[in-house]
């Protein structure tokens, strides 16, 4: 039986970052129908100055069969089930979800599980089930939605199996890969096999572009967060079923373990991704209603700046370009930020805006001429 989570971790740090939603180059237009569509990136972290986690080192042994690999690694993969409580019209509703995870480290009796952010996003209750059938209360330690990586911890006095992390940079196209996970949320421990089809695939996942491994290994909903292993029994990828089109056979994706490991280690040590840039702005999206043939086009404008925002931004600015890159969507905005490091000097072009009111409506009008300035990117999460 699942245990209800009675409380969150002892020290919870919630870091909220409002990102932009899309952009347009047109000016002197009235914005109307502003949408409630802010994009927030949240890290939740029981951050205590960096945990000392023990990992398993590799011995580079190549197994002769799939059965031998599965025997060596299957116990490192766990099932994750979640419950999310929502309230609507004074009533509470509980939604259930399921995915997979891989045990990758231990500190004392605390085991560290890597999974996808979308597996546990919004969950009020997390249950982890091992291959042997033991169930544990899971606590969310840290998460990053742009990397789609989350860390869940469990406490166990039993000795649990820990996956060996491989080197995804050394993968060869065509080599055999084995996926183990919980497809459909009810078939835990399912094993499928395929080959590595490609590396370095740039795949859009919602409002971000991720660099992923491509495989023809069968992956279904519930596999998310599970392990992708090579024939050495090394974890070389974290399965991402969210990017895998169920209508297209033989094309599935996973996060390279080298990328996931960097995110994992930074979240453990700092509580955020070291070097990731942000402007710390509260931004919304709206539609242009008039001017220069621009009616119906979408713009991004700043609804609020705060003491921690990057310098020189002003409320109601329409963000037009970042380091010369035109911002036409939230994807463009996040891509531009991903090309910047915290502490970098950045050139930004905006159109200054101001509130415009009439008898019938109110909105925001923008200057006819743009304003260009330089600012220094902030460290995301600080």
PLM segments and residue spans:
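Serine-dependent protease modules
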Residues: 26-289, 338, 366-368, 376-381
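C-terminal recognition in membrane/secretory proteostasis and scaffolding
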Residues: 2-42, 139, 172, 230-232, ...
């Amino acid at each position: 039986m699942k245990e209800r989570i009675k409380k969150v971790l002892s020290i919870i740090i919630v870091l909220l970052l409002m990102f932009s939603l899309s952009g347009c180059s047109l000016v002197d237009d009235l914005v109307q129908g502003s949408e409630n569509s802010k994009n927030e990136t949240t890290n939740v972290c029981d951050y205590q100055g960096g945990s000392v986690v023990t990992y398993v080192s590799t011995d580079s042994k190549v197994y002769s069969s799939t059965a031998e690999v599965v025997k060596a690694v299957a116990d490192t993969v766990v099932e994750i089930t979640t419950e999310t409580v929502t309230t609507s019209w004074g009533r509470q509703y509980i939604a259930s979800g399921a995915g997979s995870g891989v045990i990758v480290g231990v500190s004392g009796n605390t085991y560290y599980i890597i999974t996808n952010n979308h597996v546990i996003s919004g969950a009020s209750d997390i249950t982890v089930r091992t291959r042997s059938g033991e169930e544990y209360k899971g606590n969310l330690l840290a998460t990053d939605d742009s990397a789609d990586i989350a860390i869940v911890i469990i406490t166990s006095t039993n000795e649990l199996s820990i996956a060996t992390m491989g080197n995804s940079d050394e993968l060869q196209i065509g080599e055999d890969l084995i996926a183990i996970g919980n497809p459909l949320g009810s078939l835990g421990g399912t094993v499928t096999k395929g080959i590595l089809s490609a590396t370095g695939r740039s795949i859009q996942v919602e409002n971000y572009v991720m660099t992923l491994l491509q495989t023809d290994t069968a992956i279904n909903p519930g596999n998310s967060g599970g392990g992708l292993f090579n024939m050495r029994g090394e974890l070389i990828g974290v399965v991402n079923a969210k990017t895998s089109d169920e209508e297209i056979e033989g094309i599935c994706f996973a996060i390279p373990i080298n990328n996931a490991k960097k995110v994992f280690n930074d979240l453990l040590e700092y509580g955020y991704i070291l070097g990731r840039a942000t402007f710390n702005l509260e931004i919304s999206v709206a539609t242009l209603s008039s001017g220069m043939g621009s009616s119906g086009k979408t713009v991004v404008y700043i609804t609020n700046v705060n003491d921690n925002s990057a310098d020189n931004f002003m409320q109601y600015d329409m963000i037009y370009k970042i380091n010369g890159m035109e911002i036409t969507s939230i994807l463009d905005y996040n891509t531009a930020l991903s090309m910047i490091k915290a502490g970098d000097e950045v050139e930004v072009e905006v159109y200054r805006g101001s509130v415009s009111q009439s008898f019938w409506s109110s909105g925001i009008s923008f200057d006819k001429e743009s304003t260009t300035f330089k600012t220094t990117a902030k460290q995301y999460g600080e």
